[in-house]
Amino acid sequence: ERYREFLSRLHDPIIEKLKKGAKGLDYGCGPGPALALMFKEENFSMDIYDPFFFPDKSCFSEQYDFITCTEVAEHFFQPLKEFKKIDQILVKGGWFGLMTSIYDDSICFEDWYYRKDPTHVVFYSFETIKALAALMSWSYERRENNVVLFQK
């Protein structure tokens, strides 16, 4: 229940943007695709992809109305390559929901809990988010709780 509450930080704002029957992908869903289940419970079609737990690459030949990426982007060894993959399978006008801890100057990087996880190999600031949006020609909305919604 607490995990679903955590995931609702991305689920709730993106679901407001979706049309009935929208098709989604949980990109980097991990071993238990709880977010995909939350969307399915609300009658959205959901596919899942995770390079370790659900490595079926057939999603890369599909097109999606929305894509979620929750606590995943900090694990990208080649972030631009991953974001380009996402862009290729997101329909024009589609939504990409990103949740990751966003670094800012109020955080002492050396003490930051997020950087202490050895699997976190890249970090994002709001400047990074703006640059990513510009590079990909996406618009964006920064939401609370480390959530950003991009629209293609």
Residue ranges and their predicted role:
Residues 137-141:
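Short secondary-structure junctions
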Residues 93-102:
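Conserved beta-strand signature within the Rossmann-like core of class I S-adenosyl-L-methionine
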Residues 1-66, 81-84, 99, 116-117, ...:
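Conserved N-terminal segment of class I S-adenosyl-L-methionine
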Residues 53, 101-106, 122:
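Short "lid" loop at the C-terminus of a central beta-strand within the Rossmann-like core
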Residues 109-117:
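Short glycine/proline- and charge-enriched loop/turn segments
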